[in-house]
Amino acid sequence: MRTWYDNALNVIWTEAYPNMEQTMQMENKAVYLDPFRYNEFEGFNSHNHIVVTEVGDGTSVVEVKLVQESLNPLGMAHGGLIFTLCDVATGVAARTGGRITVTLDSNIHFLRRAKDTEKLVARGRVVKAGRTTGLVTAEVFDDTDKLIATADMTVYYVDENTYTDSAAQK
């Protein structure tokens, strides 16, 4: 049951993000299982210049070109951006098995600063895909192929009916 608050939020989001309705409509499950389609959505990833560049069986490569807004006050790539890059890389790798996932738990290790680099590249890889959860790792490299960070993510495989219209209305 929708409340007045839900309706108010819907109006605010629709005005602030006119393409959000297109993104939120999950009539075609294939869109969400095709990792390259992420590049088409005007959402968080595109706002942060994150692009999926390669997808394999349980693997992914995701890149971000650094811009001024990507940097922290010390002139290095912001840790939150590096974490987000890992989250996207692991999510894309986990989805190559044809299942919808969300991040359940995460652990990141920042190994060196990401300074004086034009882009960061994250490589995601599924370590284990279980019945309801999976373990996926990511490594982030600068443009000279130096290892910047590593991350381990536990993903939850979402029931395919979660995003149907009838489930969304409950």
Model feature map: region roles:
Residues R2-K170:
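Terminal targeting signals and extreme-terminal segments of soluble enzymes
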